[in-house]
Amino acid sequence: MSVVNNRVALTNLVSMEALTTEEVLGLINRGSEYKAGKVVISDHQKDLVANLFFENSTRTHKSFEVAEKKLGLTVLDFNADASAVNKGESLYDTVLTMSALGTDICVIRHPEDDYYKELVESPTITASIVNGGDGSGQHPSQCLLDLLTIYEEFGHFEGLKIAIAGDLTHSRVAKSNMQILKRLGAELYFYGPEEWYSEAFNAYGTYIAIDQIIKELDVLMLLRVQHERHDGHQSFSKEGYHQAFGLTQERYQQLKDSAIIMHPAPVNRDVEIADSLVEAPKARIVSQMANGVFVRMAIIEAILNGRNKNS
């Protein structure tokens, strides 16, 4: 792995922990350069990429596809429901097949935590792996677009007061962000239902009631309540959660003028955030979506750089 003039070279991208700080900042800056139209795009038509999504996705799946097409890659169609997965084929054998067919990059989302370990350790699979989200584990590309959004606003991370709020235990976004934001010098706070909080998070920040910290925050990062990962016995109604933990109009008014609101989406309106605030002046939710394309262009480019370096 290396970085020269924001041009990062990676073999795979599976977690934020695997990246150096230099690589993280290089990917953010490269995404910013793509956004500003400062990059001359090479011809990548000979490079093949497959987006293997085994969980539903709109933003991650489609922004990777847009990024790949903007870079000129050949994007292979893959529909899990119409593939041999329905005949019992394993993820490993699916990726082994795609690699054997000459696929250079597999972008994968899968419900199993750490699914990627056997893929990147395989002596036979030559395709590079980009983690588009693994269960409740990691979501590196979402984290990088979040970092770009914060950096665009403040120009730094050191000393920023950032609260990550909501369904912390089940959120791969929270885990990726807390790891790297702590490393970059941000001051982290967590809030949400106690049963959705792990003591392991104490290594990164402080668990606190939202109303104790909201006036001091620079960034409020809301998380989706992940109903699909719960057992159906959570004790909160939609209205009850919103009043106890959500961003209500009253809490919005207490934020600093310079504060920003973030959410990885999809948004449960009137649960994590009041419906009227999704596109409010302090909200950067749409900006996050847009930044996803440029960061993912930087990621795909970095993987191609790594493959060319190692070939």
From Swiss-Prot:
Protein name (database record): Aspartate carbamoyltransferase catalytic subunit
SUBUNIT field: Heterododecamer (2C3:3R2) of six catalytic PyrB chains organized as two trimers (C3), and six regulatory PyrI chains organized as three dimers (R2).
Binding site for L-aspartate: K87, R172, R224
Family membership noted in the UniProt record: Belongs to the aspartate/ornithine carbamoyltransferase superfamily. ATCase family.
Pathway: Pyrimidine metabolism; UMP biosynthesis via de novo pathway; (S)-dihydroorotate from bicarbonate: step 2/3
PANTHER family in the cross-refs: ASPARTATE CARBAMOYLTRANSFERASE, ORNITHINE CARBAMOYLTRANSFERASE, MITOCHONDRIAL
PROSITE patterns, sorted: CARBAMOYLTRANSFERASE
InterPro entries from the UniProt entry: Asp/Orn_carbamoyltranf_P-bd (IPR006132), Asp/Orn_carbamoylTrfase (IPR006130), Asp/Orn_carbamoylTrfase_sf (IPR036901), Asp_carbamoyltransf (IPR002082), Asp_carbamoyltransf_Asp/Orn-bd (IPR006131)
Superkingdom per UniProt: Bacteria
Signal peptide start-end: none
Disulfide topology: none
GO cellular component, one term: cytosol
Reaction(s) catalysed (UniProt annotation): carbamoyl phosphate + L-aspartate = N-carbamoyl-L-aspartate + phosphate + H(+)
Coiled coil: none
